[in-house]
């Protein structure tokens, strides 16, 4: 029932289509079967019958002239079905009876379900002279009496009486629902797949960043190797300092020895000079 309610809501919001007019024509024809129409006389009424339009043409003109809303037309279909259940199966009428029945149902639907509706004189004009104002007033009173002045129509009545129009919409809704379910299922599977792979990629990216942050760009040495290298540099510096000090001491010793040699040489020269001069 929920699916039919959705379909009914869509149908009531839709414009009047040829399918709706055909549905109304078929519904009206089932109220009084055409086999029950009397044989038309061959005298003055013949002129009247020659200009009687087909029921579908008659309904199409009324829809075009009045710009009637879809809910008003569909409610008239409910009145037609109520009238069908009330009338005896062997009910007879004139060839224009089906036109009168539909027009009376449409007038009552427009007056009962709309705040404003055309007057009966306007309805007489919409029939292109097929019916007079007196005809309109008479058929309206007769229909009210047949329906016992009960013009109420509920959702269940509409769903029951409009099945031929609701079924295609219901099937379209079911197909659309299945398509949405398949799309949602595919999107859910894609999200699950992405959720299953994204954390691994993210963790690998962070691990790579941490690895690059802790390792020197210009060297592949490990931390232990770097520490050993620093110690070797310190030892090399100490050895260099010692060597420098040794060289400095050696130079100092050489300078002292050279000075001593000079002193000794000078002392030797002085003695020689003194001996030469008899000192």
UniProtKB/Swiss-Prot annotation:
Gene Ontology molecular function, alphabetical: cyclin-dependent protein serine/threonine kinase regulator activity; protein kinase binding
Keywords, ordered alphabetically: Cell cycle, Cell division, Cyclin, Cytoplasm, Isopeptide bond, Nucleus, Phosphoprotein, Ubl conjugation
InterPro entries: Cyclin-like_dom (IPR013763), Cyclin-like_sf (IPR036915), Cyclin_N (IPR006671), Cyclin_PHO80-like (IPR013922), PHO85_cyclin_1/2/9 (IPR012104)
Cross-link (Glycyl lysine isopeptide (Lys-Gly) (interchain with G-Cter in ubiquitin)): 82, 121
Localisation per UniProt entry: Cytoplasm; Nucleus
Positions of region (Required for degradation by DMA1): 29-36
Modification note: Phosphorylated by PHO85; necessary for interaction with DMA1 and subsequent degradation. Ubiquitinated by E3 ubiquitin ligase DMA1 in response to nutrient condition; this targets PCL1 for destruction.
Single GO cellular component term: incipient cellular bud site
Nucleus listed as a keyword: yes
Domain Cyclin N-terminal stretches: 19-152
Annotated GO biological process: cell division; G1/S transition of mitotic cell cycle; long-chain fatty acid metabolic process; positive regulation of macroautophagy; regulation of cell cycle; regulation of cell division; regulation of establishment or maintenance of cell polarity; septin ring organization
Domain of life: Eukaryota
Transmembrane segments: none
Main location per the UniProt record: cytoplasm
Phosphoserine carried by residues: 43
Gene3D superfamilies in the cross-refs: Cyclin-like
Note from the entry: Present with 606 molecules/cell in log phase SD medium.
Similarity comment text for this entry: Belongs to the cyclin family. PCL1,2 subfamily.
PANTHER family xrefs: PHO85 CYCLIN-1 (PTHR15615:SF114), PTHR15615
Free-text function comment from the UniProt entry: G1/S-specific cyclin partner of the cyclin-dependent kinase (CDK) PHO85. Essential for the control of the cell cycle at the G1/S (start) transition. The PCL1-PHO85 cyclin-CDK holoenzyme is involved in phosphorylation of the CDK inhibitor (CKI) SIC1, which is required for its ubiquitination and degradation, releasing repression of b-type cyclins and promoting exit from mitosis. Together with cyclin PCL2, positively controls degradation of sphingoid long chain base kinase LCB4. PCL1-PHO85 phosphorylates LCB4, which is required for its ubiquitination and degradation.
Summary of subunit composition and partner proteins: Forms a cyclin-CDK complex with PHO85. Interacts with HMS1, NCP1 and NPA3. Interacts with DMA1.
Protein name per the record: PHO85 cyclin-1
Organism: Saccharomyces cerevisiae (strain ATCC 204508 / S288c)
GN (gene name): PCL1
């Amino acid at each position: 029932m929920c699916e039919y309610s959705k379909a009914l809501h869509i149908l009531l919001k839709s414009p009047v289509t040829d399918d709706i007019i055909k549905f109304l024509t078929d519904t009206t024809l089932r109220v009084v079967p055409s086999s029950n129409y009397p044989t038309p006389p061959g005298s003055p009424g013949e002129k009247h019958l020659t200009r009687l339009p087909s029921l579908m043409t008659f309904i199409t003109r009324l829809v075009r002239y009045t710009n009637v809303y879809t809910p008003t037309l569909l409610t008239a279909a409910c009145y037609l079905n109520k009238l069908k259940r009330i009338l005896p199966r062997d009910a007879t009428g004139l060839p224009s009876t089906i036109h009168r029945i539909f027009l009376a149902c449409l007038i009552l639907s427009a007056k009962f379900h709309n705040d404003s509706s055309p007057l009966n004189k306007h309805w007489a004009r919409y029939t292109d002279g097929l019916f007079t104002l007196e005809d309109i007033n008479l058929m309206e009173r007769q229909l009210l009496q047949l329906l016992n002045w009960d013009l109420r129509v509920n959702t269940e009545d509409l769903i029951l009486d409009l099945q031929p129009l609701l079924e295609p919409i219901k099937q379209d809704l079911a197909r659309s629902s299945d398509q949405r379910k398949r799309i949602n299922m595919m999107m859910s599977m894609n999200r699950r797949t992405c959720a299953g792979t994204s954390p691994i990629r993210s963790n690998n990216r962070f691990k790579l960043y941490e690895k690059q942050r802790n390792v020197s760009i210009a060297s592949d040495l490990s931390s232990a190797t770097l520490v050993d290298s620093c110690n070797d540099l310190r030892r090399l510096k100490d050895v260099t300092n010692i060597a420098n000090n040794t060289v400095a001491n050696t130079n100092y010793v050489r300078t002292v020895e050279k000075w001593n040699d000079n002193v000794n040489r000078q002392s030797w020269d002085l003695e020689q000079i003194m001996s030469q001069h008899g000192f």
